Amino acid sequence: MNKVNNYQNINSVIISKKEVGLRDLIKLKSIFNLIQIVKSEKALYSEYVKQNNIKFAIIYNYEKPIDFSINIANELKNANKIHSIIISKEKFDEEYLKLDHIEIIKDISELEYKQSLIHQKKLFCDNKNTTLDFFLNLSELIKEIVIITNTKNEIIYINEKGSKNLNLPMKTSGNIIKVTDIDIRDWEKLEKINLSYHTNSIPEFKNILITDCLLTLKNNKKLHVDIFISTIAQNNIDKLITIKEISNSNKIENYKYLEIIDSQDEIQNAKEIEKLLVNHMDIYKKKSIYLLNLDVSLTAEYEYKEDQEKLNAKILKIMYSKIMSLYSEYIFKLKHNNLIVIISTSGGEKRIISIAKKIKKTIALAFKKEDIIIFKFNIGIIEVNLKENLEFKIPKLMMATKISSEYKESNPTIYKEELPEAVILKNQNKIFQYILKAIKNDFFTLYYQKINPLKKNLKPKIEILTRLFDHMGKPIPNNQIFNLIDKYNLTVEVDTLVVKKALREYKSFVSKNGIHIFSINISPYSLKSQNFRIFLRDTLLKSQIPLQNICLEITETGILENFEIINKYFQELKSFGIKLALDDFGSGHTSLSYIKTLPIDLLKIDGSFIKAINSSEIDFVIIKSIKKIADTKNIKIIAEFVYNEEILKKIIELEIDYGQGFLWHKPEPI
């Protein structure tokens, strides 16, 4: 009987700059339903991918560094949710093996025994809306034992650490290993813990934490662990089980009951915390005391979604309840969404880091269920001594939180005197090195956001946005990228890449979307370079694109020091019909002089004014005044950061010409 293949009905493409050998083609056709062979991922337009239901891309990596293919795979995943198999003999960082949407093999023959694993990873990747994110974030979980079970409680996936350490029966033909084969017991009663229930039978418990367990490993080794069970309940996959070592001690002491101090005022001198600790000295004997600062930042997409006060209350309620369910300790509220948590433990730094990660993961999962999208979740930690003045500890705790944000995965960070500048510089250097690599290999990805006309006689536009994803496929915050690009004078290199890419995509985008006017961001620092000015002018003139459909956006920051050069250059571009826009108008100190002198067609009012238009009479008056002045010069106004109907009503009242923001369109790959 022939073995049933998981891929025969899965449409796939091959990306290869060279001709694929006959042997490889035959093997691939026996595994995949191949649709096409292309030389570049640029041939895979979103419409084509959807029409052909393409799920896999087989990427041949010839001669170039593996990062080049990883970047292609990341673009395919972000734009079209395609899973990639990279064939490469190049050496690569083992971190790439943790990527859920990529498999790397040296030769086609490896597919013979990796089919099942690849299919499983693809299944996980396609179900990211579920609690599978807990599994997909293997960068944090990979050091622990991870198990996936089906609805029959059979183990269908176990990671390397689990297979090496768990005392399981040897797998033979017809012998299915079940979760009941794992010897895990209650620490005190030594009763075997039942992991064989069906998660659908207890829907109120989507995520379960079982603490203080005794796990028997190979060679009869005993381990003190916590178990985290996460419900999946999709595609015959029932639950995910994570087993985490917590301590070598005989017993973790019970925590005291939680007391919430919910003060709206920021803690200035920490006397409130100090008083609490002194009054409960008996609780903390023989234990180390730690303060944890939990700092949550939301994506802009969610941050402007609803009333901010209601949103903050919702976030704090989730954070309180989840911390209370894990650790009965004390919580202080700071401004915004910051919480300070007091936790005592006898397990040292390793244990407090483990606790912080557990808090972070549990809260993140709770946010996900409420469709709250987190941009960053940083945790700073500092050990405190009852004899010390806590006034001097709080600023250091905030520094630890800042350091946490510099780590790629925002790992919880314990404050140490030698840490701050060294860590920040180290991580900035990593990002800078990656930017250099991105410039060399053209890793930047173009996104776009629609600019909507608010008057009948105007046409829609789009703004071209630049995004950079790291080697794990995660977006690097733009402020980090462009601060370093400006700092190290790389604006010319980046702007050159963006201009070339935008013009290359123009015809394809217009044919699919019907929007003809492109707005491309140019740094004023790039315009200092005569070579760049010549390149930009000549490239636009040779592009065969109607020049009246091209708009160049320049931020007002940086214009003043090169004002004469930029003004003269703008006059030249304007003579060719190219449109010019001034971005972030109002953020500088000499804005009005720009309106009088520069030959601009559009003003984009700084978002800080638009966001406050309903709450600040001053901002409303400023916008109204800018509009009046612009009208005298026949300059059109674009309002950025329009994220709700209330703001829209105000800008329509002011007769603003265009609106841009999440109310209409979220940025997406071009």
Curated annotation (Swiss-Prot):
Gene3D superfamilies: EAL domain (3.20.20.450). GO terms for molecular function: cyclic-guanylate-specific phosphodiesterase activity. Residues 428-670 form the EAL domain. SMART domains: EAL. It catalyses: 3',3'-c-di-GMP + H2O = 5'-phosphoguanylyl(3'->5')guanosine + H(+). Disruption phenotype: Inactivation results in altered motility. Mutants are able to survive in tick guts, but they are unable to establish an infection in mice. Its EC number is 3.1.4.52. The keyword Hydrolase applies. PROSITE patterns: EAL. Pfam families: EAL (PF00563). Transmembrane segments: none annotated. The keyword Signal does not apply. InterPro entries: Cyclic-di-GMP_PDE-like, EAL_dom, EAL_sf. Keywords: c-di-GMP, Hydrolase. Disulfide bonds: none annotated. Phosphodiesterase (PDE) that catalyzes the hydrolysis of cyclic diguanylate (c-di-GMP) to pGpG. This is Cyclic di-GMP phosphodiesterase PdeA. The gene is pdeA.
